[in-house]
């Protein structure tokens, strides 16, 4: 049933939050970062009267998926972190909740393929590393990211 599914989802979110709070290593890319946020802001619809889809609450921001806030963000990305040069790509329509965006601080500057700065942040909270960037793992030592 929907009620059982919701309860199981709440348990899973609590387990993820406890794992992150206890220092567990989490690399959250795009949808993973959204899952770790406080919630997803939605438009009301005929299917739901809720305007917020609650998430795990590990990271201190909301993500907007409201029609008025949606815009396509895509491209190749690169940045340096913990002595490694990381490359990847970004593709999403969701955005950080506009009221909180100014207070979010990235742990590094992210660049596009032409080495021009972009506004994509990379967050670090305890052993959680999160960003919209999907990383290419073939040339990096993932465990060094958590040092």
Give the location of each predicted region.
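Short amphipathic alpha-helical segments and helix-helix/interface helices
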Residues: 13-17, 143-144
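Single conserved hydrophobic/aromatic residue that forms the stacking wall/gate
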Residues: 1-8, 12
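Feature representing long, continuous alpha-helical segments
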Residues: 14, 31-34, 54, 117
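Catalytic nucleophile loop
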Residues: 17-39, 134
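Acyltransferase
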Residues: 120-147
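Short hydrophobic-aromatic micro-motifs
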Residues: 28, 88-91, 128-133
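Pocket-forming structural segment of enzyme catalytic cores
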Residues: 38-117
């Amino acid at each position: 049933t929907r009620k059982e599914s919701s309860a199981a989802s709440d348990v899973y979110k609590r387990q993820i939050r406890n794992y992150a709070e206890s220092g567990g290593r989490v690399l959250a890319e795009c949808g993973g970062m959204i899952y770790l946020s406080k919630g997803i802001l939605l438009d009301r619809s005929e299917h739901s009267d809720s305007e917020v889809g609650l998430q795990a609450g590990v990271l201190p921001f909301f993500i907007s998926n409201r029609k008025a806030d949606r815009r396509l963000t895509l491209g190749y990305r690169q940045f340096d972190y913990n002595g490694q040069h990381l490359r990847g790509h970004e593709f999403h329509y969701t955005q950080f909740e506009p009221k909180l965006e100014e207070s979010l601080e990235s742990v590094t500057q992210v660049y596009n393929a032409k080495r021009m700065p972009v506004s994509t942040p990379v967050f670090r909270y305890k052993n959680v590393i999160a960003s919209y960037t999907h990383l290419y793992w073939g040339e990096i030592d993932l465990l060094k990211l958590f040092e």
